[in-house]
């Protein structure tokens, strides 16, 4: 179920899945609020405090080198400060999806996942959408380069 909450702390404490997609410049997700078995998905900037990352049983990323290069998330800043090292990364999403590594091993594990995406993925998705729109003869042409 998805519910609108008035109290951020209560919402996080009671959530199995926490997804952050904001432009926050300060952390608002506290490590003390994360319950056992939770999945934290950070897709943007500095929403989570360092303890959310360090307290996680597993750290999963989509593209670790890209995350470190972009310096746009908590874990990237931590890596630049030497607080997270390459060997601290449990798995990449690709390794889990291909079966090379496991995701959750038990219901109590706290998993932190950082996703920055990749240009090639954006290109693949938009190409698929474009082709589908052509096939269905829907959409609106927008003069982009005028």
Name each model feature, range by range:
Residues 53-146:
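Adenosine-phosphate binding glycine-rich loop
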């Amino acid at each position: 179920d998805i519910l609108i909450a008035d109290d951020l702390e209560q919402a996080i404490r009671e959530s199995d899945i926490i997804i952050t997609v904001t432009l926050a410049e300060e952390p608002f997700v506290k490590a003390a609020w994360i319950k056992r078995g939770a999945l934290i998905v950070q897709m943007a900037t500095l929403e989570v405090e360092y303890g959310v990352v360090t307290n996680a049983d597993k750290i999963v990323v989509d593209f670790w080198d890209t995350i470190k290069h972009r310096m746009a998330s908590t874990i990237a800043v931590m890596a630049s400060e030497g607080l997270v090292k390459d060997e601290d990364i449990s798995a990449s999403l690709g390794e889990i999806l291909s079966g090379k590594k496991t995701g959750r091993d038990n219901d109590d594990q706290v998993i932190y996942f950082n996703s920055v995406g990749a240009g090639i993925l954006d290109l693949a998705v938009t190409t698929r959408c474009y082709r589908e729109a052509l096939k269905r003869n829907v959409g609106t042409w927008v003069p982009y380069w005028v």
